[in-house]
C-alpha cells in the first residue's frame, strides 16, 4: 500500500506533487493500492480550504486514492498507543521546560558539540513522575542499537542511537508530533511503501523505532527522492513561483506536461514525451538519480508545447474553452507560444472585432471591404491574388493590413500556413 500524506498548510509544492505521482504510479504497477492522508494535526498552521485544493489538484492529474484519511480523526489512537509505550517503558514523561532545554542546547553549542537529550527525566522513578504536577511531553527512548533500513534509491542507510536520540512523540497538549502520528497512521492504514522527499530521511529511523516499540512487525519499504533545485542550482524555496503547482496552472501549463516533466527529472526514460499511463509500463523507482535535479521552466514550456500538440480535439476544447473545431488552430499557434493563455489570446484575436492599425487605416478598410465581396478560395495564393487585384495594393501596404485583418496583429506566423485553418470562417473573421 502506497500513500500520499500532505499537510493543508499552504499551496502544493511541486516536490510534494512529484512524490504523489511516483507513489501513484508504483501503486498501479504492483496493484497494491494508494491512499491519501491529510495530515492536519498542526492546527495553528492549517489553512481552511486547502484539503479541497489538494483533492482538486490530484484529480487534475488523474490520481484517484482508494481511501481518504484525516489524521486528526486518529487522535484517540495516537493517545492510546502513546500510553502503551509509557506502560511498556519504551517512552517516558519529560518535564523539562523550554528554558531548561534551551540552556542545554546553548551550552552544547558553546562547547562545539551536537545537542542530545541528556536523559534527565528518563531516570525519574515512577513515584517521582506521579508526584510531579508540571506539564510534560512524552519522549521515545533512544534506541540501544543502530537503526538501519534499505532505501530503494539511496541504498543501505544507518543511524547511530545518538543521531536518533530521545525524541518527543506527544506534546504537552496531548497532541502527537509529526513523527508519531505518521508512524502510527502508516501502521494502522496498512502502508507498506513510502516514497517521499529526502528531507524525511532522518525521520525514518524514528518512525521505525516507534512501530518497533509498539510491536509492529510489518515490513516498511522506503524511497527518498532527491530535492529539486531551481535553475541557479539552489534548493527551491516555497516562496519561488515555480515551486507552486497552483502557479504553474495559472501560467497555462497542462497537468499532463507537469507530470511528464516531474517524471523526467533525474530519470532515464525511453522517450521525452509521455503520459502517466505510459510511464506505468516502464517506470522504475530504483532508477531515479541520487543527485538533485534542476527544475527548468523553459524545459517545461517545451514539454507543454508538445502536449498541446498531442492533445485530442476534445481535450483542447476543454482546456481552452473553445469549440473543438478550432483545435488545429490552437496546435498551429504552438509555434509561437507554449502556454495556454498566450495561445488562447492569439486565437481569440482572430475572431474578435479588428481595429485598423494607425499607419494602415485606409489600406485596412480597402482590404476589408474587398474581402467581403470575394468568394471562398481553396488556397492562400488564389485568395491573395484576387484580393491584390481587387484593391490594387501590394507589398507592405497589402500584407501588413491583411495580417491585421486576419489575425489582429501586425506580426505573426506565415499567412499562407494560417489560411487553410481559417478559410472556412473568413466571413466571420473579417465582419
From Swiss-Prot:
Official protein name in the record: Glutamate--tRNA ligase 1
GO biological process: glutamyl-tRNA aminoacylation
First-level EC class: ligase
GO cellular component: cytosol
Protein family (similarity comment): Belongs to the class-I aminoacyl-tRNA synthetase family. Glutamate--tRNA ligase type 1 subfamily.
Keyword flag Nucleotide-binding: yes
Primary location class: cytoplasm
Functional note: Catalyzes the attachment of glutamate to tRNA(Glu) in a two-step reaction: glutamate is first activated by ATP to form Glu-AMP and then transferred to the acceptor end of tRNA(Glu).
Catalysed conversion reaction: tRNA(Glu) + L-glutamate + ATP = L-glutamyl-tRNA(Glu) + AMP + diphosphate
Stored Pfam families: Anticodon_2, tRNA-synt_1c
GO MF, one example: ATP binding
Listed Gene3D superfamilies: 1.10.10.350, HUPs (3.40.50.620)
Motif ('KMSKS' region): 235-239
Assembly behavior: Monomer.
Motif ('HIGH' region): 6-16
Chain sites annotated for binding ATP: 238
Subcellular location, record wording: Cytoplasm
Record key words, sorted: Aminoacyl-tRNA synthetase, ATP-binding, Cytoplasm, Ligase, Nucleotide-binding, Protein biosynthesis
EC number: 6.1.1.17
PANTHER family: GLUTAMATE--TRNA LIGASE, GLUTAMATE--TRNA LIGASE, MITOCHONDRIAL-RELATED
